């Protein structure tokens, strides 16, 4: 039984790194890790306030001895695993980046969570005890190296704890969508009073639940916030934002670090928008024609919405 384990949550970034003959770089978990002997992509936890692209460069260097540069986003995944010997269950939101080697040489490690870094062909990797997220990222059959909890524990998507300086801090993973319909309208939501960005138009979406995949979370949030049923078209990117003293309905400053995955979503059969989650962070939802969206003053859009709409070339 895993239901009595303490639930934890983290965000992590990993590297898909291949060489000139298409071998992939993997690292082995040491006896100090929760899954000794298993192999995974190099990477690790995103520090509070850290850009995940910096995380993947830092962690790859530490675990392999190689300096890498980020070429692009490969995938966004989520998984749960139980570690009964430590008394915990961990949900990890994993940002997987494609990287290229700038220099350095492979280095083994002692008394660290990983101990070896090696290059493998895909066929060789297939024979290894791979962490499930690594197998998924490489398009290989998933293994049973991880112990999966019996069921997801209760755990809030927003969870603030006292930081080392005494100020509450929260790191939150969320999924948002640039949503369009067959008439090329764009769906936006308005932020409720009392929340950061109150009164501004925002992308549909929000925090993912414990044990939930980001795509599934986004489709759920779309229904709750707008009453629309959508389908995922593609992954646009990931953004990281820190507000060192964010003010929300809690009524006190929070050192807030948000990591957001952005998707393109299409609603094939649009309906008049309705907000089912009354009293939450969304007070209104509306379809905008392209010209209406382009005419909105910049200060009427949240910063992340303006950036995402521009990236999707909708204005």
Model-inferred region functions:
Residues 36, 106-170, 196-198, 272-315:
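Nudix hydrolase/Nudix homology domain
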Residues 17, 96-100, 121, 179, ...:
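Short, well-ordered beta-strand micro-motif
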Residues 7, 38, 87-93, 111-114, ...:
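A generic structural micro-feature
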Residues 67-76, 229-238:
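A short coil-to-beta-strand element that immediately follows conserved catalytic motifs
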Residues 1-16, 142-178, 191, 253:
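Acidic, metal-coordinating catalytic segment for phosphate/diphosphate chemistry
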Residues 78-106, 239-273:
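Active-site-adjacent beta-strand/loop module that shapes the phosphate/pyrophosphate-binding cleft
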Residues 23-63, 185-228:
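Conserved Nudix-box catalytic region and its N-terminal flanking loop in Nudix hydrolases
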């Amino acid at each position: 039984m895993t239901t009595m384990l303490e639930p934890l949550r983290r965000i992590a970034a990993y590297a898909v790194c291949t060489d000139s003959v298409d071998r992939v770089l993997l690292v082995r978990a040491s006896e100090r890790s929760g899954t000794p002997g298993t192999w995974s992509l190099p990477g690790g936890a995103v520090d509070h306030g850290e850009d995940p692209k910096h995380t993947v460069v830092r962690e790859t260097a530490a675990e392999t001895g190689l300096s890498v540069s980020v070429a692009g986003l490969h995938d966004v995944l989520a998984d749960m695993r139980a570690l009964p010997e430590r008394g915990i269950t961990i949900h990890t939101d994993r940002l997987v980046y494609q990287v290229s080697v700038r220099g350095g040489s492979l280095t083994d490690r002692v008394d660290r969570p990983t101990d070896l870094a090696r290059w493998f062909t895909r066929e060789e990797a297939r024979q290894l005890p791979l962490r499930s997220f690594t197998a998924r990222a490489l398009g290989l059959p998933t293994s049973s190296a991880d112990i999966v909890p019996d069921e997801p524990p209760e755990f809030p998507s927003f969870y603030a704890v006292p930081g080392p300086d005494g100020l509450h801090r929260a790191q939150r993973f969320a999924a948002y969508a640039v949503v369009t319909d067959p008439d090329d309208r764009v769906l936006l939501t308005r932020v409720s009073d009392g929340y950061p960005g109150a009164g501004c138009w925002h992308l549909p979406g929000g925090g993912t639940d414990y044990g939930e995949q980001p795509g599934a979370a986004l489709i759920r949030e779309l229904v709750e916030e707008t009453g629309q049923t959508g389908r995922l078209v593609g992954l646009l990117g990931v953004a990281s934002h820190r507000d060192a003293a964010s003010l929300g309905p809690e009524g006190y400053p929070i050192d807030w670090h948000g990591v957001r995955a952005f998707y393109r979503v299409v609603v094939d059969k649009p309906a008049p928008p309705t907000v089912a989650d009354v009293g939450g962070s969304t007070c209104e939802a509306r379809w905008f024609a392209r010209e209406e969206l382009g005419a909105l003053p910049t200060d009427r859009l949240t910063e992340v919405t303006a950036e995402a709409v521009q990236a999707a070339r909708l204005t």
